[in-house]
Amino acid sequence: MQEQGFILWFTGYSGAGKSTLANAIAPKLRALGKRTEILDGDEVRENLSKGLGFSKEDRDTNIRRIGFVANLLARNGVVAVTAAISPYRQIRDEIRSKSQAPFIEIFVDTPLELAESRDPKGLYKKARAGQIQHFTGVSDPYEPPQKPEITVRTAEEGIDACVTRILAYLRSRGLTG
């Protein structure tokens, strides 16, 4: 019998901690015997969505591509861990509705000021200077999930505590074996 895959969909501002959490939880899932792949928004944009800009239409296309690959992995027994801003609720809900495996939305709820202070690439600074258009939290909106399965607050909890809570949730759903 094939292992059940599922999707962990991390969403939040740039600098919220999505990639950090994805990279922290993936080895824990692998240690539990779960085949696990990370779909990082920056890497997907570079490899599958090259040529797309940051208009709403292009962002929606990028997120749909991530959702398609995540669903493909999950329905083949892989845990797909996604880390992408995915700022628009309607597209996240669309991905959830198309998922053929359990979809766990994880809202990385970080105050914009903190996310901005963590910005190693200087993207917020460039956006505030008008050098980057359509930047979430500056010139474009972020629509928080209305009913995420899990909310983590990286301003209040350490990464290990967040990962522990996520793993506890997955255990409670019978997804970690």
PLM features: residue spans?
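The conserved Walker
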Residues: 14
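Conserved beta-strand scaffold positions in the cores of enzyme catalytic domains, especially
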Residues: 38, 103-105, 149-151
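ATP-dependent NMP and nucleoside kinases share a basic, alpha-helical "lid"
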Residues: 47-53, 70-127, 134
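Conserved substrate/cofactor phosphate-moiety recognition/catalytic segment
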Residues: 23-68
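Small-molecule kinase domains that catalyze NTP-dependent phosphoryl transfer to phosphate-bearing small molecules
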Residues: 109-112, 117-165, 173-177
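Conserved lysine of the Walker
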Residues: 18
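Phosphate-binding P-loop
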Residues: 1-5
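Hydrophobic anchor at the beta1->P-loop junction of P-loop NTPases
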Residues: 10
